[in-house]
Amino acid sequence: MKVTKADIVISAVKPEQYPDGDLPEIALAGRSNVGKSSFINKILNRKKLVRISSKPGKTQTLNFFLINEMMHFVDVPGYGYAKVSKTERAAWGKMIETYFTTREQLDAAVLVVDLRHKPTNDDVMMYDFLKHYDIPTIIIATKADKIPKGKWQKHLKVVKETLDIESGDEVVLFSSETGLGKEEAWKAIHKFTKTKNA
């Protein structure tokens, strides 16, 4: 998809701050510093729409981005960062749970994982959480450029087996450096949004 417009609409922490309307929403989740911001910037053809923080756990709000006036991307705060306090972690959990369980406009989630490494317990918990609430999920296995092409399938197998991916959920090989998987990611996203924009 050609992105001609992408703007941040609001940074929200509670439902009354979520944007009005019935545009489809895609939520983007992932471990702190997994490359989620780079994925969003790459897929939207923007260099700095989402700031890439050197400090993990920096984003503590749900950031809503309006794409081509057609859909919202919702950047979910990264999880699994050890230095976040218990209080902050509890607040994060409540905010995420409220959004994922009550937001009617939510059509699917994108879960960004690092292809180089076996998914963490936090990745597994996040995927299980999404599946518990029957949220269709697209797995973006990023940083494919960091490992030899001949090892991609082996690493993909580890990702699929560790997360115990359901048959309907797609896994897309991705690289924010080379753009690998960009078209495939959009195709997967459009499966969930096109019905509302047909």
From Swiss-Prot:
GO biological process: division septum assembly
Binding residues for GTP: 30-37, 57-61, 75-78, 142-145, 174-176
Gene3D superfamilies: P-loop containing nucleotide triphosphate hydrolases (3.40.50.300)
Domain EngB-type G: residue ranges: 22-195
One annotated Gene Ontology cellular component of this protein: cytosol
One Pfam family here: MMR_HSR1
Source organism superkingdom: Bacteria
Task of the protein: Necessary for normal cell division and for the maintenance of normal septation.
Family: Belongs to the TRAFAC class TrmE-Era-EngA-EngB-Septin-like GTPase superfamily. EngB GTPase family.
This protein's name: Probable GTP-binding protein EngB
Species this protein is from: Bacillus anthracis
The gene coding this protein: engB
